[in-house]
Regions:
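Helix-to-loop junction immediately C-terminal to a conserved catalytic motif
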Residues: 50
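Conserved ABC ATPase signature
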Residues: 133-137, 141-143
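Hydrophobic anchor residue at the start of the ABC signature
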Residues: 147
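A short, proline-enriched helix->beta-strand linker immediately N-terminal to the Walker B motif
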Residues: 152-156
């Protein structure tokens, strides 16, 4: 399902313009990553897709249908949503957390729980965790449950709002690799928000670098942005001048590899997006 922003502006009650005349098409069955520093408007963009935030002006469409014409509750039930810190219901078991949205959508509890068990397998969690509560899980396990819940209604669109920002670097790498695998297997339209350009390049087919007010500094594939940063701001943001953390592209027989200055592989780019993990 293609998502399109058409001249969208969001002005909050205090006068802050979070999004200023934003227009962009987010291609279907691809991962689009909004990346930028805190306060640039990336999360506001994401939350307007499922109408948690309403635009002040402009229009957002899904497959050319304005989302403002749809019931917001029904819209949200058809869009997966994964948050930082998972946002799990503390008094529900893992199984019931995952099964919640399908049950609310009219699926029988038995069917929803059966599907929830399948999703635990898909996101790499042992079924033995199904009867545990969120407080009994590690941070990484909670995030995997959050991803499973986001996929529970088999949505065409999955929104991911800095989902790995609160876990340690090792777990974060594992979750990033798992996200690449899931997208390859499930073929969803994914919108991912992060402040980390390395994460954006690892996960994104289309990367959107944002400045304040959600103004687009550059949009393109990771390789396009790395090879041809549009402005000095983009060049600095993507790490061209970051010493040991600088990123570069390396051609190999297996494709184009994203490496840091120490030669460590950060991802594999094939075509316009990530096809393999770390």
């Amino acid at each position: 399902m293609a998502i399109e922003f058409r001249s969208v502006t969001k002005r909050f009650a205090d006068g802050t313009i979070a999004v200023d005349d934003f227009s962009l098409v987010l291609p279907t069955h691809k991962t689009t990553v909004f990346v930028g520093s805190s306060g640039c408007g990336k999360t506001t963009l994401l939350r307007m897709i499922n109408r948690l935030i309403e635009p002040t002006s402009g229009e957002i469409t899904i497959d050319d249908e304005p989302i403002q014409d749809r019931d917001p509750v029904q819209l949200r039930r058809g869009i997966g949503y994964v948050l930082q810190n998972a946002g799990l219901l503390p008094h529900f078991t893992v199984l019931d957390n995952v099964a919640t949205v399908p049950v609310l959508s009219g699926v029988s509890k038995k069917q929803a729980r059966a599907r929830a068990l399948e999703l635990l397998d898909i996101v790499g969690l042992d079924r033995a965790l199904a009867d545990r509560y969120p407080r009994q899980l590690s941070g990484g396990q909670q995030q995997r449950v959050g991803v499973a819940r986001g996929l529970a209604a088999d949505p065409d669109i999955l929104l991911m709002d800095e989902p790995f920002g609160a876990v340690d670097p090792i777990v974060r790498k594992e979750l990033q690799t798992e996200t690449i695998r899931l997208q390859r297997d499930l073929d969803k339209t994914v919108v991912f928000v992060t402040h980390d350009i390395d994460e954006a390049f690892l996960l994104g087919d289309q990367v959107v670098i944002l400045e304040k007010g959600a103004r687009i500094a550059q949009v393109g594939s990771p390789s396009e942005i790395m090879e041809n940063p549009a402005t000095d701001f983009v060049a600095e943001f993507v790490g061209v001048d970051r010493g040991s953390r600088a990123l570069s592209l390396k051609k190999t027989p297996h494709g184009t590899v994203l490496v840091d200055a120490a030669g460590r592989t950060q991802g594999v780019l094939t075509g316009n997006g990530p096809e393999a993990g770390l």
